[in-house]
Every structure is written in C-alpha cells, then in structure tokens.
Regions:
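Polybasic/polar functional segments that serve as interface/processing modules
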Residues: 1-67, 71-151
Length: 151
C-alpha cells in the first residue's frame, strides 16, 4: 500500500478586490510571496493576461506547482496548490493570498494525493470561511426578507 504522496489544495476566493485581479505585477508579487512564505522552491514562472480581463499565472515548484486564475468581472480567484513532502507549508501560502486578494468568502478543499489505501481520501475536506461584513450583510438580507413576508 502506498502512503501519502502529497497535498492538493483548491481555493475558491469570492468577492475579491476587483482592481487587484487584473494587475499582472500585483498578482505576480503576491504569488511569489506565497511561494516564499510556504517554504517552496520556485523552478519556473509563467503568466498569461487575457483580453479584456483576467490572468493565469503558473509556478512550477520543486515540491509541485501553484496556479492562480483570476476573473475580475466576477471578483473571483481560483488557486491550485499541489505539494509533496513535509517541508512546504501550503496553508501559509493561502494566508498570503487571502491577505492580498481580500476575499469576502473562501472555500478551501484539501485532497490527499496518492493515499490509495485510505477510504477517507474519497471525501476531500472542505473548509468555508466568510468575512464578518459578509455575515452581517447576509443576516441583514435574511431579516429584511423575513420582515417583508410578515405583512
């Protein structure tokens, strides 16, 4: 039976700051900071800017890869981090990305790669988090909807 080969994290960031998502230099710097903070070794780096908006940036790492795809019109960013070994800290990379893109809501899915003998691998762990202001807005909308039905 094979043991765990690597960690694969997919991160969906909703409600990101619009202007940052189409700024090539900002996203590059953010991604390089995330690679460094996650104790990963950069081998190669490539970027493509789409017209009229959006970016795809890929980092080939000694430990795996990291990709960032931005969708400015949707205020959405999709991130993919795959690492092998125990020396890297992909969760630290996520912290850097969250601080830079400032999403209102984030969904992180953790997948254990190569853990063939584990049934728990069949169900990835999913973590949701929402900013406090988003919770206030959502609650306010629910209260308003409830009160408007009462009449």
């Amino acid at each position: 039976m094979l043991g765990l080969i690597g960690k694969h994290l997919t991160i969906d960031m909703y409600g990101c700051i619009f202007k940052t998502l189409d700024d090539v230099d900002f996203v590059k710097e953010t991604m390089l900071a995330a690679v460094k903070e996650g104790n990963m070794t950069l081998l190669n780096f490539t970027c493509h800017k789409f017209e009229p908006q959006g970016l795809t940036i890929l980092a080939l790492l000694a430990e795996g890869h990291m990709s960032v795809h931005t969708y400015p019109t949707m205020s959405y960013t999709a991130v993919d981090i795959f690492t092998i070994g125990e020396q890297s800290s992909p969760n630290q990379s996520i912290r850097v990305l969250k601080q830079s893109f400032k999403p209102e809501k984030i969904k992180t899915t953790n997948i254990k790669r190569g853990d063939v003998g584990s049934l728990s691998d069949m169900k990835p762990k999913i973590k949701l988090s929402t900013t406090p202001m988003r919770r206030v807005r959502d609650t306010s909308a629910k209260v308003f909807k409830f009160l408007s039905r009462s009449r």
